[in-house]
Amino acid sequence: MKKLMTSVAMAAAIASPMALADTTPVMFSTLDHTNAPAGDSVGGVRLSVLHGQVAEVKGVDFSLLGMSETDRTTGVNFGLFFGGSKVNQEMKGVSLSLFNWNEGQTTGVNLGAVNVTNNVEGLNWSAVNYSQGYTMADIGLASISKKSNFQLGFFNKTEQIDGVQIGLLNCADNGFFPCFPIINFAK
């Protein structure tokens, strides 16, 4: 047993620098997975032009004239001059972009012209919010989700409202009316 524990400790000690070797503090990303310096993880600042892709960003991710794509982001996505962000698995933090496209779990705030999300524990604030899962709070001209706790806008639509909808037209499959002006809430 002692030899096994020693072997596991040695393997972990050897593997840990290799795991960190692919992380860089600063990166430039563009088309065809071109990353300078080469790597798949950023722990600092990344600038993405046109369409940059990496597995993970922990820090600030700037997108310029195109889309920044990651699997996981912890920090801030910031779209500059028609920049947007796409997170495939998990976003923790704030996305401030022309469009925010988060396919997995989001914890934080999405602020943009268009938000396309899955599950959001936080706030979606944009002209158009579209979510295939649960949203805690949506504020916008139009908000459409599968399930929501709170929606505020001109048009709000969800299959299941847990809290309240406030707007010109509010539709919820479980609402006290399927569609109702000004306010709607669960039966």
Predicted features and spans:
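Sec-dependent signal peptide recognition
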Residues: 2-9
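Surface-exposed, glycine- and small/polar-enriched segments that build interaction surfaces at terminal
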Residues: 21-187
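N-terminal signal peptide c-region/cleavage motif recognized by signal peptidases
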Residues: 16-18
